[in-house]
Amino acid sequence: MIDRVKILVGLLALIANGGNSFAQPDTDGGGSLTRLEGGGYVDEDTVRTARETLSHSVTLPEWKNPSAFEKDVFTFTRIIFWADPAKQVERGGFGGGGFGGGFGFGRRGWVVDYPDADLNFSHRLQQLTSMKVDPDARVMKLTNPDLFDFPFIYMEHIERMTLRPAEVLALQKYLKAGGVLLVNDFWGALAWKNLRDEISKVLPGRTWTELTMEHPIFHSVFNLQGPMSRLRVPSMQRWNTDYNPNDPNSNPTASYRGEGYETMHVQALLDDKQRIMVLAIHNSDISDGWEREGEYMDYFKLFSEARSYPLGINIIFYLMTH
């Protein structure tokens, strides 16, 4: 059984520092190689941590946990998966436009926002809560034998994700043992269909539950207020700079993301005890708020500080304690 609770002793001691809590930091081909958004490559077969991958956004502080806590820490763990280039994606989606093409990029959606999102979010968890957090974050395949050491795993841009039989079996065992998967940053009807189809191989017979703003996940640490559209985060490259957060009819996303992209949804697959096994944030990109926090102050204030970090912290707290 994966133990979620032992790494969260004292999590509720959230550091209260008013409006300055999220102070913005200073900015400064094929095979197993995959090209990163910011340039450079990562080897899927040998990479172990996000920290070892070249960061392109900000310079992050490093920290060390007390030796007694080195293993009992929360580790943000990103999953490497295969993206089938033959799968249809929405026009303008990842691989269908924008980031299409290139050496190993556009085929493997797992690298989007990596490694900056992973490292920034880990830093904010360490900074803003009393949680002990792994400063390096992990990245691995579902077939990695270390998978069961980490109660939380993360995927994004799953439009073309295709799980192989060994991955299906590993993920099924992981989720049934108490692990939880967060899926984020996928847009439109085709992307949703692909997630539904792939996860149905893992958890056949389970049906998705739509979470409303009344769900405690939205109030576990930060008391987030609805409607759901107030939590929506656009990708920075697609941000509508005329967006008015006080106007419920104002769309933060400036460009078409495929049929069915207009509304943010948060959906979950539950086990027989109503524990969340898979949480999916559809038509929103909270990880861009983590990745891009040091690049543009207006985006940081509107989305990183007000939405991405509060929602992310709420999600981790709730998933690790329920």
Language model: regions and residue ranges:
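Surface-exposed patches in mature extracellular/periplasmic domains of secreted proteins
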Residues: 131-141, 183-186, 206-214
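Bacterial N-terminal signal peptides
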Residues: 6-18
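Extracytoplasmic/secreted envelope proteins and their assembly/folding machinery
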Residues: 118-122, 168, 172, 192-196, ...
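Active-site-proximal beta-strand/loop segments in catalytic clefts of secreted hydrolases
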Residues: 79-82, 155-158, 184-187, 211-214, ...
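An acidic, glycine-rich "communication" segment
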Residues: 29-41, 51, 55, 191-291, ...
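Short alpha-beta junction capping motif
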Residues: 76, 147, 152-192
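Aromatic-Pro/Gly-enriched surface loop or interdomain linker
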Residues: 23-152, 158-159, 285-288, 292-322
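N-terminal secretory signal peptides that target proteins for export/translocation
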Residues: 1-4
